[in-house]
Amino acid sequence: VMVTKNETETLMEEAIGEKISDYLTKPVNPSQVLIAVKKLIEGRKILGTKTSQEYIQQFNEISRMLLNPMDLEEWTSLYRRLVESEFELDQHPELGLQQTVTDQRRESNQEFCKFVERNYKGWLENPDIVLSPHVVDKYVFPHLNTPGPVFFFVIDCMRYDQWLVMEQHLQDLFTIKKDFYTGILPSATPYARNAIFSGYFPSDIERVLPGLWSTGEDDDYSMNKNEKELLEKLLERRRIRLRTELKYYKIIDPEYGKQMVGNIASFAKNHVTAIVVNFVDMLAHSRSDTPILK
């Protein structure tokens, strides 16, 4: 902790550059010193206690919510609270609450499955529910009237907790707005991702665009080989003309991802660039075969 009479900005910047923990300017009263010392010595303990208290309160609130009927928006809110609290508690393993979180998540999953079974059929006819085929219309096309390039990333099999980690690295570079949509069933890649790019449900792709729908005899990855063409057909149906040719890339391993980073400046010339990040999905499917990933 640096205590000084000097209030010049250059000294403050130099002190920050030296990674000081706190900066106090004279005259200093005892309460300032006390809070600086407590933050350094007991800060983690105090934060852990506060986190524990907030989680216990949330645990009780979620337990009450699970006893009552909820709509999709309330379930989404519950899911966010569960994941975000788990994310916070991961920073404080000394609290010993991980098993409690796991148990409540399991109970929530069971109740949510029942909720989906009761309501999924109705969602298919509800225009207020954003499903996989509606993603591009709702979240991508509205940006096409802007003068700059539009990048559409699909990170297959990424969980919300994984996004929270990524978000920490992006929030200083971008203005981030989070929203949620409801995935279709089956949620497997060949169905869900084709639905996103085509704007159709899988049965409609097979009926309207049979040449772009692969049979179930193919593997999961070849069943998604026509995503660029499906997106082009969706643009045609919406009578949208791009300023440049649609660009589509699929990142199947980190090395190819690094190559794309090296060429990122050239992508700025494109009107729309769609990028599928596939290696997260491949990694998830490899867990059962790779001991280190278990």
Q: Where do the PLM segments sit?
A:
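His/Asp/Glu-rich, glycine-adjacent segments
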Residues: L47-R118, L124, D128, Q168-T175, ...
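Segments forming glycine/polar-rich beta-alpha architectures that bind adenosine-containing cofactors
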Residues: D128-Y191
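Flexible loop/turn segments at secondary-structure boundaries
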Residues: T8-E9, R159-W163, D281-H285
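The C-terminal output helix
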Residues: T10, V37-T51
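C-terminal output helix
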Residues: V28-V37
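Alpha4 helix (beta4-alpha4-beta5 surface) of REC/receiver domains from two-component response regulators
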Residues: N6-D22
